[in-house]
């Protein structure tokens, strides 16, 4: 599947490519690929051609799992996903360079208009297919879990609460033995959907403590910054008293905060994250198959965890090209299937989407056509 | 650290002149003095709360001081300065070895876990979690780097030849100056430039291995020019003049006399340039993309490359984090080995081609 | 071709012009001009992408205070890290080059040079992770010590970072990265110092250091500066290692050892670019243009320094 012959080759350099191809006859695990796909027994249609996506790197681990599963069913489809970032993903999709985009944010109105143009004037689908709870995690000797109200979390990250034995923390955790240890809040140094969702949460739930507008770039000056999820988790692991926010699946041995929701404290979990997404209102004024949502940060619902990252798959309802339409349709229906969501969850630690979200997404996937 | 390298190699034998007999320290005295200084330093640091770094710092300073003072008293100022510089230069070398050893150890320690046959024979095609390898990425990096070298070295070398052998006046100054400026292009900008260029030529959805090679060439050419220029400048004029005097045309003089004389330096320069670009991540991601299967044709579609592979294994690991980190470190290890191998090849070539010298 | 008709050396005028000569000289010149074209292409691309950010109203630029306020701390961070790296690396590199060429036993010298070259082979991502995992934690005690004893200097005002991921650490990581570049070129230049000069110096009774000072260093000076400029270019433009190690994003400060550091231009682009949209992209590319201009200025300065004394080169 990979040594395609569609070529823009310049004859002069064919010799070079030729010699290299001679010495390399393909990876050991690729030769038997077409025999391996027994997963989709019911689906007998044979797909081929390219399926190209680009976008959020947050989906990278999940995408690897989806790709593996999808190519098991359709070994002849040439699938690739470039983790160039959400902005780049949306841009490339709108420019027609890719078949679908992965994005940590829904299209804004301007982009939506452009995207509709790209989709032959037709509808655009936006499916919240990757839902990941963001945990507030900390490194504090002898403390594995803490209950914190949103205002307390905001205070910690603004620097107003500077020590772990602060009365505001102690008030919610009467049973914990809080050491006299300075708090080192760690934030993401890169522009990320995680920061955007986290600051949005603080802004909406603790507006009087956290006054900065939500942004993908950490809006406060100074403080400890690190690059990417691995970076912030690494710093927290090696620094006593440090606290950060990161995908819940990466918490490892670190302490995890249960955040105050209504009158209870909810720990991050797949179920709690899926619950809040299901109960969040849709963005208004969107098309029939556009399921962009506004996550309900101020939820008081029992068992709902409001700090979640929702990452979308964005594509067309109507493609110019039959192969593209078939491939996107097949891929999306695999992604939203129970099997697809579980495979991703096993590899990436995200929260599988709920049954009603799946039904909703199914209507969009079934509507995909070529024309 | 620097105690195991001898601080004072035997100085050139001074002829004992008839006028005066020089007073010299016995052969092994500087080493002994140095070690005594180091021991004193270790003692001192033990008194003031010992740590490895303070022991080394005190030791080196006191050892150097001991050698200098003894030499100053016995051998006089000039000799003492010489010994001081010897100590300093050796220390500099020792200091540089510390990060090198630490780095190599870190990479080996983390990278050997997955340094197995699977890593070299398998790709990441349909691999989730553990297992898989970098076969596709290793070959992708080889193809793209080779292509970038094929583009950069002729252009860079010819430019260096032009600057040293032909150019005069304003054009020479302009090229020299702007080549230096070019070294400051951020790698992501080079990537975006190549992306914009190919988008302009072939439309929006183009992703080719050769785009990455072009982006890398933008980064590589100035390094090739700059290092080749420095080396070519050093070829003695006498050689050129001798060749001209024999009636050899200028271009044959350059090809047959100047380049072979400088070949060792040119090899180092090109290797440095390759090393400069082989680990670039950002420009390759925007131009070459990332795939999990094997694609070896740089003129058709996306390819996988080692640095991009390593970077995303490191920064976007899944729940089985250790498997991803192991693959990333092994990829880094392979990258280093690749460049080392290149280095060896360059050295062999230069040894083979270099003219025999008198001694 | 026509421009090279009148070379400064009279000897080439006497040589007969053969077709081979013409082709060779022409293609050499074409390569040089081609490089200028590529650079012009990059510059045109940068400028055209940066214009929207240059003309946008101040409140639309990320940060809300205009391009100047956005770029200024980045410029400071870039220069701070690169200069620190150069200050640390250049003397060390010259020392290494001298050691390998004139001090180390002949038999091991080549191996040692090779070992140092190895540093250049390590990809910058690896430097980043080494800096993060090994160097930064190792330097924490130094940070605390510096804040206590050197706190009166604004560079070490503190409070000391608890993770060690500071501008100081970045400077050292960059120094390690550019060390092989400077030392490889210095080594090459030093080893080419004319044997006659060296032997003459020794024959006159010079010590080894005096021989180096009189015969090797003047000869190799322009090469060392050239190598240092290459290293500086790398340090200014280094992206991934800085992005991984530095705890950046704070405003302008000279403080090298606190956890609030200005970011550098290149690392800021790498960190912000993937998720940037619209004017954000233009702003980042405008900052890339600034880096371009800084490199230009640095090189002008370096040229001026080199040219103050006549070139000491075999080809002159």
Placement of each model-derived feature along the sequence:
Chain C
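Transmembrane alpha-helical segments of polytopic membrane transport and secretion proteins
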Residues: 1-31, 302-316
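Periplasmic/extracellular loop-to-transmembrane helix junction in inner-membrane transport proteins
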Residues: 9-27, 46-87, 105, 160, ...
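Transmembrane-helix boundary motif in ABC transporter permease subunits
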Residues: 16, 85-116, 129, 302-311
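Membrane-interfacial helix termini and adjacent extracytoplasmic/periplasmic loops
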Residues: 55-72, 127-176, 247, 256-257
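Hydrophobic alpha-helical transmembrane segments of multipass integral membrane proteins
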Residues: 76, 80-88, 92, 96, ...
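Transmembrane alpha-helices
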Residues: 118, 122, 126, 182-193, ...
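C-terminal transmembrane helix and the adjacent membrane-cytosol boundary/short C-terminal tail
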Residues: 187-191, 195, 202, 271-316
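Glycine-rich helix-loop "coupling/hinge" segments at transmembrane-helix boundaries
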Residues: 235-278
């Amino acid at each position: 599947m990979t040594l395609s012959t569609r070529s823009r080759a310049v004859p002069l350099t064919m010799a070079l490519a030729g010699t290299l191809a001679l010495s390399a006859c393909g990876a050991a695990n690729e030769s038997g690929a077409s025999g391996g796909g027994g997963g989709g027994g019911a689906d007998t249609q044979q797909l081929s051609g390219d399926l190209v996506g680009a976008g959020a790197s947050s989906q990278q681990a999940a995408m690897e799992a989806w790709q593996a599963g999808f190519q098991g069913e359709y070994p002849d489809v040439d699938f690739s996903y470039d983790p160039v970032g959400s902005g780049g993903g949306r841009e490339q999709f709108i420019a027609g360079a890719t078949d679908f985009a992965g994005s940590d944010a829904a299209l804004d109105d301007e982009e939506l208009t452009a995207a509709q143009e790209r989709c032959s004037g037709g509808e655009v689908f936006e499916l919240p297919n990757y839902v990941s709870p963001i945990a507030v995690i900390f490194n504090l000797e002898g403390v594995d879990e803490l209950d914190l109200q949103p205002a307390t979390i905001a205070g910690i990250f603004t620097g107003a609460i500077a020590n772990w034995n602060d009365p505001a923390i102690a008030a919610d955790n009467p049973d914990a033995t809080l050491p006299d240890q300075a708090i080192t809040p760690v934030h993401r140094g890169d522009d990320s959907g995680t920061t955007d969702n986290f600051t949005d949460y603080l802004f909406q739930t603790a507006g009087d403590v956290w006054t900065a507008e939500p942004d993908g770039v950490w809006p406060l000056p100074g403080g400890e910054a690190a690059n990417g999820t691995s970076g912030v988790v690494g710093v927290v692991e090696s620094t006593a008293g440090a606290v950060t926010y990161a995908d819940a699946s990466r918490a490892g041995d670190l302490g995890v905060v249960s955040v105050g929701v209504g009158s209870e404290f909810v720990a991050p979990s797949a179920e709690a994250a899926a619950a809040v997404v299901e109960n969040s209102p849709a963005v208004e004024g969107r098309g029939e198959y556009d399921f962009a949502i506004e996550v309900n940060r101020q939820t008081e619902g029992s068992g709902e965890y409001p700090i979640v990252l929702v990452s979308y798959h964005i594509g067309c309802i109507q493609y110019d090209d039959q192969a593209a339409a078939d491939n996107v349709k097949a891929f999306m229906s695999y992604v939203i299937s129970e099997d697809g969501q579980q495979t991703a969850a096993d590899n990436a630690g995200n929260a599988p989407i709920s049954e009603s979200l799946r039904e909703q997404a199914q209507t969009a996937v079934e509507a995909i056509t070529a024309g | 650290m620097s105690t195991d390298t001898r601080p004072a190699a035997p100085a050139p034998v001074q002829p004992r002149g008839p006028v005066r007999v020089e007073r010299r320290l016995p052969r092994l005295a500087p080493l002994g003095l140095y070690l005594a200084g180091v021991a004193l330093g270790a003692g001192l640091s033990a008194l003031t709360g010992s740590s490895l770094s303070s022991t080394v710092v005190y030791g080196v300073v006191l050892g150097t001081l001991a050698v200098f003072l003894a030499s100053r008293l016995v051998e006089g100022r000039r000799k003492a300065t010489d010994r001081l510089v010897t100590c300093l230069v050796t220390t500099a070398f020792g200091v540089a070895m510390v990060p090198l050893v630490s780095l190599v150890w870190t990479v080996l320690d983390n990278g050997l876990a997955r340094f197995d046959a699977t890593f070299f024979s398998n790709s990441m095609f349909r691999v989730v979690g553990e297992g898989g390898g970098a076969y596709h990425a290793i070959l992708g990096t080889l193809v793209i780097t080779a292509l970038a070298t094929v583009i950069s070295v002729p252009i860079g070398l010819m430019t260096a030849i032009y600057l040293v052998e032909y150019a005069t006046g304003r054009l020479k100054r302009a090229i020299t100056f702007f080549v230096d400026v070019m070294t400051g292009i951020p790698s992501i900008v080079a990537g975006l430039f190549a992306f914009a260029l190919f988008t302009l030529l072939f439309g929006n959805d183009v992703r080719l291995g050769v785009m990455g090679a072009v982006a890398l060439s933008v980064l590589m050419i100035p390094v090739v020019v700059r290092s080749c220029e420095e080396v070519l400048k050093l070829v003695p004029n006498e050689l050129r003049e001798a060749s001209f005097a024999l009636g050899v045309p200028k271009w044959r003089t350059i090809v047959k006399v100047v380049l072979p004389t400088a070949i060792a330096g040119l090899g180092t320069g090109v290797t440095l340039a390759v090393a400069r670009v082989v680990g670039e991540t950002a420009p390759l991601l925007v131009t070459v993309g990332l795939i999990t299967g094997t694609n070896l044709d740089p003129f058709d579609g996306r390819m996988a490359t080692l640095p991009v592979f390593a970077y995303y294994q490191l920064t976007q690991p899944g729940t089985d984090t250790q498997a991803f980190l192991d693959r990333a470190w092994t990829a880094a290890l392979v990258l280093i080995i690749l460049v080392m191998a290149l280095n060896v090849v360059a050295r062999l070539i230069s040894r083979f081609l270099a003219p025999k010298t008198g001694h | 071709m026509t421009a090279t008709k009148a070379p400064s050396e009279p000897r080439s005028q006497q040589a007969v012009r053969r077709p081979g000569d013409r082709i060779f000289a022409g293609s050499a010149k074409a390569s040089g001009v081609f490089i200028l074209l590529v650079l012009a292409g990059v510059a045109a691309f940068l400028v055209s992408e940066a214009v929207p950010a240059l003309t946008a109203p101040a409140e639309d630029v990320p940060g809300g205070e205009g391009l100047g306020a956005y770029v200024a701390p980045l410029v400071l961070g870039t220069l701070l890290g690169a200069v620190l790296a150069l200050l640390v690396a250049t003397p060390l590199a010259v020392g290494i080059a001298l050691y390998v060429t004139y001090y180390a036993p002949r038999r091991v010298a080549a191996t040692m040079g090779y070992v140092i070259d190895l540093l250049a082979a390590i990809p910058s991502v690896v430097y980043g992770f080494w800096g993060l995992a090994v160097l930064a934690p190792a330097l924490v005690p130094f940070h605390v010590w510096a804040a206590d004893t050197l706190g009166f200097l604004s560079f070490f005002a503190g409070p000391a970072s608890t993770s060690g991921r500071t501008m100081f650490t970045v400077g050292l990581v960059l120094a390690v990265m550019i060390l092989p570049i400077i030392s490889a070129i210095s080594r090459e230049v030093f080893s080419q110092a004319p044997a006659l000069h060296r032997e003459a110096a020794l024959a006159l009774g010079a010590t080894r250091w005096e021989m180096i000072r009189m015969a090797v260093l003047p000869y190799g000076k322009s090469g060392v500066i050239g190598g240092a400029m290459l290293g500086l270019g790398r340090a200014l433009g280094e992206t991934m290692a800085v992005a991984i190690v530095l705890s950046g994003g704070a405003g302008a400060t000279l403080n090298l050892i606190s956890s609030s550091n200005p970011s550098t231009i290149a690392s800021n682009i790498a960190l912000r670019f993937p998720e940037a949209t619209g004017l954000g992209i233009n702003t980042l590319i405008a900052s890339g243009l600034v880096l371009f201009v800084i490199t230009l200025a640095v090189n002008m300065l370096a040229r001026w320094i080199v040219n103050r004394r006549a070139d000491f080169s075999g080809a002159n």
